[in-house]
């Protein structure tokens, strides 16, 4: 049988419960989301021309996987011992974030990150702010991060 997939229209995808959601965030990032009826989905995030932190948060049900396509990110989290830590991820690297792990991401200028969100996320909003982690991560400027992670 010849491989000849049929294109699916946005209207047909919408009937299947698939939603498109495109936003520009306050930090200049552009996010292009594809979300299923169960709340799981994919997001392609384009960093702005200036590196910036996102907003610290956690999920009660969702697992997220961040994949660095280009550029680099700093991934911050509060671990199970309640310690704040930062990790540098470069092109081709990824991190998996489990439910209830408070996390944040600093995206380098013009970076591209893919995020996959899965789990039982169809019970309403599953995004909860983490002021404690914001206080920690947002105290680091891009210059500070360069000093901490010399190999950037």
Please give the residue ranges for each predicted region.
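Short, surface-exposed charged micro-motifs
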Residues: 65, 86, 104
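Short beta-strand His + acidic residue motifs that chelate non-heme Fe in jelly-roll/DSBH
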Residues: 55-57, 75-76, 95-97, 102-108, ...
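Conserved short histidine dyad/triad with adjacent acidic residue
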Residues: 44-61
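Flexible, glycine-rich phosphate/dinucleotide-binding loops
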Residues: 74, 82, 122
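A short, N-terminal "cap"/entry segment at the start of jelly-roll beta-barrel domains
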Residues: 1-41, 55, 87, 145-152
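Double-stranded beta-helix
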Residues: 108-152
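Glycine- and acidic-residue-biased ligand/ion/polar-headgroup-sensing regions
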Residues: 61-79
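Short acidic-glycine-tyrosine-enriched beta hairpin
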Residues: 79-100
């Amino acid at each position: 049988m010849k491989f000849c997939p049929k294109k699916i229209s946005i209207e047909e995808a919408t009937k299947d419960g698939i939603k498109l959601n495109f936003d520009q965030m306050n930090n200049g990032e552009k996010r292009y989301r594809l979300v299923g009826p169960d709340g799981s989905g994919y997001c392609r995030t384009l960093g702005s021309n200036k590196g910036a932190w996102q907003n610290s948060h956690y999920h009660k049900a969702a697992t997220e996987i961040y994949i660095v396509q280009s550029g680099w990110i700093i991934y911050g989290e509060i671990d199970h011992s309640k310690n704040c830590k930062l990790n540098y991820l470069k092109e081709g690297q990824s991190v998996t974030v489990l439910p209830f792990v408070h996390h944040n991401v600093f995206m380098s200028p013009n970076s591209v990150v893919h995020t996959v969100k899965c789990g039982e996320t169809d019970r309403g909003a599953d995004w909860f702010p983490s002021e404690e982690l914001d206080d920690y991560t947002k105290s680091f400027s891009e210059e500070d991060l360069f000093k901490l992670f010399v190999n950037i």
